Amino acid sequence: MKGGKRVQPARPNRINKEIRATEVRLTGVDGEQIGIVSLNEALEKAEEAGVDLVEISPNAEPPVCRIMDYGKFLYEKSKSTKEQKKKQKVIQVKEIKFRPGTDDGDYQVKLRNLIRFLEDGDKAKITLRFRGREMAHQQIGMEVLNRVKKDLTEDSDLAVVESFPTRIEGRQMIMVLAPKKRQ
């Protein structure tokens, strides 16, 4: 829609004249309790301090209001939410494909990659694919998966097995490893 009115997003807290209560429980600029006062008195005190009267808890009886700089309050709030988002780690599932005949050199390279994924905190999905006549030798595939499991869970204590295949699904077996939680 072109040329439409831009709607201001609703504020989460009421400030100054938007507060509807007749009496409020007032908190000062530094967080000290002032007590229960009339709305007009609270607005005067906020005006004297040169800042806003912000309704913190509207559902309380009487509503809790604080004398503070609302712009600074919003800035601090957005800053803290950004910090929390930064700290969150998105866990990805990385996949490595093996074959029953994977040679020792290739196995070591793939194992190094698995170790790197787990150290970075990502889950690892190991897919073992069977082609053609390899389907007749499923026990070789299980040996490869057991070797990976042994190298990563028992020997290096890096991972926890989330799912281990009991049978073949289609032409492949899938094992999922999760990184061990660090203390």
Swiss-Prot record:
Question: Under the GO molecular function aspect, what terms does this record hold?
Answer: ribosome binding; translation initiation factor activity
**Primary localisation category:** cytoplasm
Keywords in UniProt for this one?
Cytoplasm, Initiation factor, Protein biosynthesis
Xref: SUPFAM superfamilies = Translation initiation factor IF3, C-terminal domain (SSF55200), Translation initiation factor IF3, N-terminal domain (SSF54364)
UniProt similarity note? Belongs to the IF-3 family.
- Is Cell inner membrane a UniProt keyword of this protein? no
NCBIfam families attached here? infC
InterPro entries for this protein: T_IF-3_C_sf, T_IF-3_N_sf, Translation_initiation_fac3_CS, Translation_initiation_fac_3, Translation_initiation_fac_3_C, Translation_initiation_fac_3_N
Name by which UniProt lists this protein: Translation initiation factor IF-3
How it assembles, according to the record, is: Monomer.
- State the Gene Ontology BP annotations: ribosome disassembly
* GO CC annotation terms, alphabetical: cytosol; membrane
The protein's location, in the record's own words, is:
Cytoplasm
Question: Gene encoding this chain?
Answer: infC
Described function? IF-3 binds to the 30S ribosomal subunit and shifts the equilibrium between 70S ribosomes and their 50S and 30S subunits in favor of the free subunits, thus enhancing the availability of 30S subunits on which protein synthesis initiation begins.
